[in-house]
Design a protein with these regions (language model features):
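Conserved acidic donor-binding segment of nucleotide-sugar-dependent glycosyltransferases
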Residues: 303, 313-325, 333-339
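Nucleotide-activated donor-binding/catalytic signature segment of Leloir-type glycosyltransferases, i.e.
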Residues: 243-261
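Short hydrophobic beta-strand element within catalytic cores of glycosyltransferases
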Residues: 289, 298-302
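Carbohydrate-associated surface elements
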Residues: 161, 179-182
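Membrane-proximal helix-turn-helix segments that form the acceptor-binding/catalytic region
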Residues: 133-155
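Aromatic "clamp/platform" in nucleotide-sugar-dependent glycosyltransferases that forms part
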Residues: 281
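Conserved donor-binding/catalytic core segment of Leloir-type glycosyltransferases
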Residues: 156, 189-218, 231
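A short, well-ordered alpha-helix in the C-terminal region of glycosyltransferases
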Residues: 227, 340-354, 363
Length: 393
């Protein structure tokens, strides 16, 4: 039976700590909902369970996906497994357990197939976000408990780096498929490249994104480039700390905090920026890399962050650096050398066109269909059965 025939009428439940409407939602949630839409297009019933937040309905259906929200960002895990145990989702054919550091441990309460979706392993984030015993417990759950609970389950990683990290945790066997992110269509804007030096950083404002490194780079380069501006796009609970850091660094008007913006403004910033800075401690993939690339904006990121080793083609679509000192040096070189910037811009645009949501949805659907059949796979961006040779759209 072809994948599409098998999936039609199946009920897939995603357990996630948040959705895209949540103020703290980001690239991981966009990926989840893109995959959910792909399953809906194949005839699946899809429920996304996530934490409640102010102003959001507890239950709603949007574009074919049923959203159910219960609990807070800490109690959502217990609420999710309780709802699954009490069969409040109705008949379920498969569960996608989204492990953003903390898993739902859904395998303990259901005999249905469970697919574990992982963007990246949080070894570095736990002590940063939760210093002390709480962070140690969280890392123990992710490092030791989860691999044992999900022994024999199918995994989906968004990059080879994440697959490697999972194997290092003991997730063994040919059961970690890689399904890369796609890229959203470009939102038309009237913006053009800034006439004066402009950098941007885009994402949630949380400690492990290390936006301070971008601010420090701008302050260090300001004497040579007095009109240089860094546009910080995004919001989050670390935003006030970043404002304080900019103030303490005497960044002045060199740093522009855009806050949470709509899609049009985000794409205006991508279009205007000369270079995007991605100073994250860890990234599963780096969805914003391809978004910036669609606007011919190359990225500078840390090699040690994991996912950017794949989303950034070092020396062709951007530059991977080793530390904060090299980050500042490379940014300075790019600002001085328009020919180098232009070459990287060409590469960033070309690379961004290789990854599409249509292809990712087909690959994810294949993994889900295989799991329903009781099969495991470690393939990379597979095509659906019965759909050979289709080009990404």
């Amino acid at each position: 039976m072809h994948d599409r025939d098998l999936l039609a009428g199946r009920h897939v439940v995603f357990l996630s700590w948040r959705d895209t409407r949540n103020p703290e939602g980001g690239g991981a949630e966009r990926y989840l909902e893109a995959m959910a839409h792909g399953l809906v297009a194949r005839g699946c019933r899809v429920t996304v369970f996530s934490a409640a937040f102010a102003g959001a309905p507890l239950t709603e259906t949007d574009d074919g996906i049923r959203f159910v929200r219960r609990g807070s960002k800490t109690t959502v895990y217990a609420q999710g497994v309780w709802s699954l145990l009490r069969r409040r989702f109705g008949r379920v054919d498969l569960v996608v357990d989204v492990q953003n550091g903390m898993p739902f441990l859904s395998r303990l309460v259901t005999r249905k197939p469970v697919v574990v979706l992982v963007h990246h392993v949080h070894r570095e984030q736990w002590p940063v976000v939760y210093p002390g015993p709480l962070g140690k417990v969280g890392w123990w759950i992710e490092r030791w408990l989860a691999p044992r609970v999900y022994r024999g389950c199918q995994y989906v990683a968004v990059s080879h780096a994440t697959r490697g990290d999972l194997r290092a945790l003991g997730v063994t066997g040919p059961r970690i498929a890689v399904v890369h992110d796609g890229t959203d269509p470009v939102v038309p804007t009237s913006a053009t490249k800034s006439a004066t030096p402009m950098l941007c950083t885009v994402g949630r404002l949380v400690p492990h994104k290390q936006v301070e490194h971008a601010i420090d780079a701008v302050v260090a380069l300001r004497d040579e480039f007095p009109t240089l501006r860094l546009h910080v796009v995004g919001s989050g609970w670390w935003e006030a700390a970043l404002h304080e850091h900019a103030k303490a660094s005497d960044a002045g008007d060199s740093v522009v905090f855009e806050g949470h913006v709509d899609e049009v403004r985000k794409h205006e910033v991508f279009e205007s920026a000369w270079v995007m800075v991605l100073p994250s401690l860890k990234e599963g993939w780096g969805l914003v890399v391809a978004e910036a690339g669609r606007h011919r904006t190359p990225t500078v990121a840390y090699r040690s962050a994991g996912g950017p080793r794949e989303s950034v083609a070092d020396g062709r679509s951007g530059v991977l650096v080793e530390d904060q000192q090299e980050l500042t040096w490379v940014l300075g070189q790019l600002l001085r050398d328009p020919a180098w910037r232009e070459a990287l811009a060409d590469g960033a645009f070309d690379l961004s066109r290789l990854y599409t949501w249509g292809h990712a949805q087909r690959s994810f659907a294949h993994v889900i269909a295989a799991a329903i059949r009781g099969e495991l796979t470690d393939s990379e961006d597979p095509e659906e059965d019965g759909d050979p040779g289709r080009s990404p759209t």
